[in-house]
């Protein structure tokens, strides 16, 4: 219908939608990732779990709004999580379960724009998944992020491209599922060696906020050039600055968030021209701003360095 689209097909989006698909691809292409096993039966998964060292890493195969992963040393918690996945309580459908090796190291996210001819690096970030301060509590869709990641060097980026991204793009082409769009690689770095944790086939939330404020209007050039398979002619400049975003979430998130709360009287924002507020779970009712539960806003600041950006966002 003559509509320009920059994004993967449904088949290519399996890179995010099915962890078992991506893990099996890694095995086939020798892409560095954690060792793993895939289970279709609850008893088999729990039996295997008891043979593994802690902490356990358990994942629902399908999409789960950022809540389909458990990292825990508690066998009872791990058992309950497995049971919930097979019962269809976690994720969109009754899912297979992946139990994988816990990878030591520091995590980061690296982002690429990809068309049928070209792979372009467009930025990096680090995010915080746990609900509470000091990286504690259950996993969420993301409670904050900053960009760029100080872990990423030119040498490490080269390794990520050659050992992870290029083999992935090759595999998708070989299997008739050629990828185009934004590819977000969630990685762990240990002794200078990157390993793949997972893929998203989009920017991610809240990573999108910090990347887009730093890319500025270039984001539109990326979209249009990518949709027309012209990324090779595009020069992308990563700004020499930093951005940070902090999520404001409803009490009880992610397990039992309240909803329909009126926000007008409780939001006291100290204005700063560097601050951008992105709405998530909000709506207007009778001229009052209300929430739908879960993540409500992200407060995002771009500044000359991360320390300044962090100061401004928390003062706001």
Kindly label every feature range from the protein language model.
Residues 1-17, 30-40:
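A short, GP-enriched loop/loop-strand-helix hinge that lies immediately N-terminal to
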Residues 285, 291-316:
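Generic C-terminus detector
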Residues 5-8, 35-38, 56-60, 71, ...:
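General beta-strand structural signal in soluble alpha/beta enzymes
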Residues 14-20, 132-134:
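Short, charged, surface-exposed secondary-structure boundary motifs
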Residues 68-211:
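Internal nucleotide-binding/catalytic subdomain
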Residues 66-68, 244, 293-299:
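Short amphipathic alpha-helical segments
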Residues 160-183, 200-274, 280-285:
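Active-site "cap" helix and flanking loop/linker of ATP-utilizing ligase/carboxylase catalytic domains
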